[in-house]
Amino acid sequence: MFVMVLRIILLALFAYCIYAVVKYVANPKRRLKLAQSKEHFYIIDEQNNTRKNFQLTYKGVLFEGEKHIPSKDHPLFIHTIFVWTESPEKLKHFSAKDFENIEEKVLERYPNCKIDWDQPIKLAKKAEER
């Protein structure tokens, strides 16, 4: 009887370990940080939730986008997206093409929206366009 209970406990412990590993590997925040460290593109977004901001990383810079809806009548229609970064000093290496790529990726998800950039990003875009 004791051996049977011990086997059940070990089986439950093994199942919990597998669950914890899968949950860790599938964590989107961990995947975002990994993509940021490898300077890849990755986006975390809940398209059905208009109140939740999205995060994206591109070339090692983490951006955040705030979705704006025009009125409460259309809760699923995104009108404007305001994008900013906490580290504008990393934008020195960005070209105008990089900002266009980010806009394309966002517009793939929200085709009828206008993208507003934060002031440091606007300045970096204008400096690159000159």
UniProtKB/Swiss-Prot annotation:
Q: Where are the transmembrane segments?
A: 2-22
Name used for this protein in its record: Sigma-w pathway protein YsdB
Function as written in the Swiss-Prot or TrEMBL entry: May mediate a negative feedback loop that down-regulates the expression of the sigma-W regulon following the activation of sigma-W in response to conditions of cell envelope stress. Might interact with and inhibit the activity of the protease PrsW, or could bind to the anti-sigma-W factor RsiW and thereby protect it from PrsW-mediated cleavage.
Entry's induction text = Expressed under the control of the sigma-W factor.
A GO CC annotation given for this chain: membrane
Top-level taxon of origin: Bacteria
Where is the protein localized?
A: Membrane
Record membrane topology:
Single-pass membrane protein
Which UniProt keywords are present, listed alphabetically?
Membrane, Transmembrane, Transmembrane helix
Q: Look up and give the organism this protein is from.
A: Bacillus subtilis (strain 168)
Statement: the UniProt record of this protein carries the keyword Methyltransferase: no
